[in-house]
Amino acid sequence: MGNKPTISVSHLGCEKNRIDSEHMLGILAQQGYSIDANEELADYVIVNTCSFIQEAREESVRTLVELAEANKKIIISGCMAQHFQEQLLEELPEAVALVGTGDYQKIAEVIQRVETGERVTEVSQNPTFVADEMTPRYRTTNEAVAYLRVAEGCDYRCAFCIIPHLRGNQRSRSIESIVTEAQQLADQGVQEIILISQITTNYGLDLYGEPKLAELLRALGKVDIPWIRIHYAYPTGLTPKVIDAIRDTPNILPYLDLPLQHSHPAILKAMNRPWQGQVNDNIIERLKQSIPNAILRTTFIVGFPGETEEHFEHLINFVQRHEFDHVGVFTFSPEEETPAYQMPNQVPSEIAQARRNYLMEIQQPIAAKKNQKCVGQTVEVLIEQENPTTQEYIGRSIRFAPEVDGVVYVEGEGQLNSIIPVKITDADVYDLYGKVI
């Protein structure tokens, strides 16, 4: 056991990738490999790459090149390995193995083969694997927070997206499997779990013949975890049944992450999104009526091929009309394997960037107003960090998801990884400030 090499993992990309990294670490730790966060001390560095858009690929390439220059033995896993496969081995002699998105469960076997001198390619052309509660996992988030994947892959074919090509079709886990893992996390002291998949509202469709998110939420309501947050909720899947489950289940937070991407019907149709513009209006109004304290986050893509000033104006009005709590804006990234790459009327990047900046400017006063409404309120805050210099704590209220939203700066006595009452005394565009009650 002591002779096994030391492994480090460089995690890039989204939280779905993070879970893959955590499973690889768990499998290796269980099999007696030493894990070290310091890449300099590792015999092998697994780089779990992202290939969603050009910017993500560039970050992955930079990381790979830096490790290659340091003469590290590199195992490339994740979406770039799935995307480019043998091309990566040709361009990076230091890479000793490729592991696809549906093959990370074989990581220990891959390293054993590499140790015999083999240069390994372990990439399934159509990924089918989905980890469950039996797959070892070594969490890399703070003690109080964990991501919980309810399904892998995607059945939609949006015109700008290569995710189905990289991760395969949707494969849902059973309700029993997810609840069992949630209970395991509760037993580890986790205070918040974040449900993720490519389309969380489509959960169960492939397994049960119909979406089962409402049933899953009610089952998770029986697990002793204070906060359960839903990411990637498609508006068309927010049926009255799902909305009722969110409203009626105390530990399901009234926080919804809605990847709308645009508001104009013509752009949504060109994007091949599974709804049209007017549906967004109706669903968002219904959400606000059914869950008056709903916290809504969304993302938009600007500069999609064919987007005119009129289309963009429609989006501006939509954002102003609905006053989302949190908005992320991305410029369109042309991906070669997608229909959008070949579309006419490509928008110049400088125009797309200007539209992104303008939309973010429109959102800022809305976000500030939403945060300002919290001043004077006492809210529950999950304490995640302590600043040893100022004795100040940093945490999040239910308004804020990890990494993508703001934080709460807290004065007073608190305990890490616990949820405590905090009176909000001040706010800015992104963050809140308060004192322990």
Curated annotation (Swiss-Prot):
Q: Which cofactor does it need?
A: [4Fe-4S] cluster
Q: Where in the cell is it found?
A: Cytoplasm
Instruction: Tell me what reaction this enzyme catalyses.
Output: L-aspartate(89)-[ribosomal protein uS12]-hydrogen + (sulfur carrier)-SH + AH2 + 2 S-adenosyl-L-methionine = 3-methylsulfanyl-L-aspartate(89)-[ribosomal protein uS12]-hydrogen + (sulfur carrier)-H + 5'-deoxyadenosine + L-methionine + A + S-adenosyl-L-homocysteine + 2 H(+)
| Positions of the Radical SAM core domain | 140-369
Any single GO BP term: tRNA modification
Q: What is this protein's function? A: Catalyzes the methylthiolation of an aspartic acid residue of ribosomal protein uS12.
Protein name (record): Ribosomal protein uS12 methylthiotransferase RimO
> Its encoding gene is what?
rimO
